[in-house]
Amino acid sequence: MKKSTLIITILLGVTAISFAFYTTSEVVFTRYVDEDSKSQLSYLNFNLVSPAPEMDSSNYNDEFDATIQKFLKRWDIKGASVAVMKDNRLIYSKGYGVTNLETQEPTETHHLFRIASASKLITAITIMKMVDDGILNLEENVFGEDGILSSYSEMKDPKHKKVKVKHLLNHKGGWSWRDGDFMFQAAKIKRIMKLEGPPNDDDIIEFVLKHRRLRYKPGTQYAYSNFGYMLLGKIIEKKTNESYEQYVIDNILEPNGIYGMRISGNYKWERRPFEVHYFNHPGAYQFQSFDGNYESVEKPYGGSDINTLGAAGAWIANASQLVKLVSLIDPNNSYQLLSEESRALMVSGKNYKDAFGWKGARGENYWRTGTLAGTACFIYRKENGFTYAVILNSSVWMGHRFNKYIKWMMDKAILNLENHQQNLFYQNQNLKNILPLEI
C-alpha cells in the first residue's frame, strides 16, 4: 500500500469514529525508535494515545494561567498538566512548561504523567465496582484457607488470616511503618529471600507473611500501606483471571471514555508514548538501582520499582482523565458508575482517613495525593462544585508535604474560572490531537 493511501485510510477511519476525545484500539503500528522522541514511537496502539480536550486560545484565562506559571517558576517545576471541572463540566484543561529539558517540548493536554499514589483511587473504584457486580465481597478474608489469596499459606503471624478486603481499602490491615514500606525494600527482600533478581509482587507477599508480624489487630488502626493496595491488585487478578491493568482498562476506564492510561515503567527507556520526562529536585542524591544493575541512578529512573507498585502507585495519566474519573463517582452527577451504597462507603468513614481510595474525605470535600521522586499529583473534589487535578513532572525537597502548596495555589487560581461555562468533555478536537503520528 502506498504511503499516501495508508495515511488517507487512517485519517478517514479515525475521523469516522472520533467523538470528543475517544479513540479506537483496532490498529497497531510498529517501528524502531530512539527513547526520547515523541514523534518517533516504538509502537503505537491507538488505545495508547492519550487524546485530551484542548481549549481554543480564545478561552484561555490570563489570570489563571499566570497563577500556575508563577507557581511553577517559584518551585522550579518543569512541566504540569492541569484540569478543572465545575459541576462535572470540564471547563479548563491545559499543559504548562516542558516535558523534556533537552528538547524543550511544550507540555500539552495529552501528555501522560506518573500519578503515584493517586493510583489508589483507581484501584478502590475498581474494587467497589466488583462489589456492585457481585464478583467480590468486602468481608472476604485475604489470606488463609478460605481467603482469596489462599495460595500464600506460610505465615509467621496467624493474625494475617483476619485481614479482610475492607481493611486494605482504608489502610487498616494491621501493618506498621515501623517495619518500613515493604514496597520500597527491594534490596533487603532480595537478600533475605535469597532471590536471584529483584522481588516481584509474589516475592514481596511471601516475605511479609513469612518474616513480619502484624503490629495491630486488623481493622483497628490506620497505618498507610502501599503493600495493602498492591494486594488489592492481586485480588482483582485472582477474582477476574485477568491482569490488574487490563481489567481496569476494559471495565472501568475505556467503557467511560478514558483512553490511554497505563501502568508505568521504571527506566527512561520504558517510557510510554507521550509520557513526560521526570526530574528530581536539585541536590537530590543518586541511588543504586532497585534491581542492582546500576550503581548510581537518578531516583525517578530506577531508584524504585514503580511497576511492581501496580495498584498502589504505578498509573500514568493526564489531568483531564483524572477529573473525568472523579466525575464517575461524584454524588451530584446524573451518571453514576457505582451504586449509591458503594459510592457512599468510599467517603463515609468516622474519621477522614477512613475513605476508600481517597487520601481523605470531610463532608463533600474529597482529596487524593500522589508523590514519588520526579512526580507530584493532587486531586481535589470540592463541595462548591469544583474539581481539579494537577500533575507535575518534577519534585521538590519537601516531598509529600508539597501537596498543601498545590492546594493553596489551585484554590486561589480557580476563583478566576467562576464564569467559565464550556464543557470540553463534549467538544470535538482537532484531528492532530487524536492522531499525532508520523508515517
Residue ranges and their predicted role:
Residues 56, 60, 64, 111, ...:
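Residue-level signature of the cytosolic catalytic core of signaling kinases
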Residues 155-365, 377:
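Short, surface-exposed loop or secondary-structure junction motifs
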